[in-house]
Swiss-Prot record:
This is Thiosulfate sulfurtransferase GlpE. One of its GO terms (biological process) is glycerol metabolic process. The lineage of its organism: Bacteria, Pseudomonadati, Pseudomonadota, Gammaproteobacteria, Pasteurellales. It catalyses: thiosulfate + hydrogen cyanide = thiocyanate + sulfite + 2 H(+); thiosulfate + [thioredoxin]-dithiol = [thioredoxin]-disulfide + hydrogen sulfide + sulfite + 2 H(+). The gene is glpE. Residues 18-106 form the Rhodanese domain.
Length: 108
């Protein structure tokens, strides 16, 4: 089991999702998530954490994304401490994801 997470680019995150079925966990606030988020992202909050644990396998890769790639680091480290084996944080956060032209879902 890894003792820390790895920071990856938005494109590396997309490759993990496409090739290995990684779960992408968006930790931004509900309003921002509802407005737009990475395609198929799980909205991870204190309230949804129990469902996250039920749905996500500890051995599968988990990628955490936030606004700019800062607060996702804390959540990624927390998930490592909870026993998840392969945890990643997206450098640049959702801003970087969007600038990279990766798929998003929007309310508009």
């Amino acid at each position: 089991m890894s003792e820390t997470f790895t920071e990856i680019s938005p494109h590396q995150a997309w490759e993990l999702i496409e090739n290995e079925g990684a779960t992408l966990a968006d930790i931004r606030d509900g309003r921002r998530y509802a407005y737009s988020h990475p395609q198929d992202a799980f909205h991870l909050t204190n309230e949804s954490y129990g469902r996250f644990l039920d749905e996500v396998d500890y051995e599968e890769p988990v990628i955490v994304i936030c606004y700019h790639g800062v607060s996702s680091r804390n959540t990624a480290q927390f998930l490592v401490e909870q026993g998840f084996d392969r945890v990643y944080s997206v450098k640049g956060g959702f801003d970087g994801w969007e600038r990279s032209g990766l798929p998003i879902e929007t309310a508009y």
